[in-house]
Amino acid sequence: MTAPLELEQIRKAPKALLHDHLDGGLRPSTVLDIAGQTGYDGLPATDVEELATWFRTRSHSGSLERYLEPFSHTVAVMQTPEALHRVAYECVEDLAEDSVVYAEIRFAPELHINRGMSFDEIVDAVLAGFADGEKACAAAGRPIVVRLLVTAMRHAAVSREIAELAIRWRDKGVVGFDIAGAEAGNPPTRHLEAFDYMRDHNARFTIHAGEAFGLPSIHEAIAFCGADRLGHGVRIVDDIDVLADGPDKGKVRLGRLANILRDKRIPLELCPSSNVQTGAVKSIADHPFDLLARTRFRVTVNTDNRLMSDTYMSREMHRLVQAFGYGWSDLERFTINAMKSAFIPFDERLAIIDEVIKPRYAVLIG
């Protein structure tokens, strides 16, 4: 019997990340540094370890709404070009250190205007941080490609403006659009104008759906909004039955929505640890990730918010390995799923799969 993969082994594997929030992945030390530099005095702790613990425990709240509350502190220290550049640069460094070779990072420009920056200045600062981080990592022998998704908050009314922002920057590092925030009372159909604008410009978008809210959210995101991917989408399990008895015991039966999702190969940006924190699932072992993977949905592994969940890609993969016994071939499949689903051109996706991911996994598999 093959020994289970250890965390340090998984660290060596190339990874592709599709769902990670810039304002949810700051280093605790950076939060403290920028707070001191900018005069923000609202932090709940002044010690690095205490602050990290506060973010983790406060985010383990059991609901999406309470999970989102700690973001007020990270957003508060991301209100200058210098702060945004630093956070973006360090994001690239941290991902590359974890052997991530491709990442799409998202954030909501509308949350960073408190000190007078325009949306374009905000995006420019983040992309400059990404570019400088990529150069530094390449020079250090850890090449990585990082692209940006601009997010509109679903409770606000600027989604069309953010969609226009995505198109203005589409050839400079922005590869798509997203809506995020509390799902309850904020259906994706409120933002049809933004999604129509993206389609009119042949652009890609993902939608947070099926995280805290159920099947109606997923149905609207796919049927009415035309999402290319689903942020989370974990509640699609509500449309899947595993027969408990009879001659077909154990057989999986999909409802119509689940069938459409699988048939159209719509990627699921699954974030296991985050889903436990928000109460979407009780534990990693209870997460429907394995059911969805075995049923051949296009599942991907993601971090969501590295600071709030005290996580990183290797840890997310290791937790899935511990829960479901996955081996190298499984992790390779999930990684290729993510790379196939990226919002960069086909030839660029294929090059990373064929020239980076497959060769490095071939060495690991042996």
From Swiss-Prot:
Keywords: Hydrolase, Metal-binding, Nucleotide metabolism, Zinc. Its cofactor is Zn(2+). Zn(2+) binds at H19, H21, H208, D304. It holds the Pfam family A_deaminase. Its EC number is 3.5.4.4. The keyword Hydrolase applies. Disulfide bonds: none annotated. It catalyses: adenosine + H2O + H(+) = inosine + NH4(+); 2'-deoxyadenosine + H2O + H(+) = 2'-deoxyinosine + NH4(+). Catalyzes the hydrolytic deamination of adenosine and 2-deoxyadenosine. Belongs to the metallo-dependent hydrolases superfamily. Adenosine and AMP deaminases family. Adenosine deaminase subfamily. This is Adenosine deaminase. The gene is add.
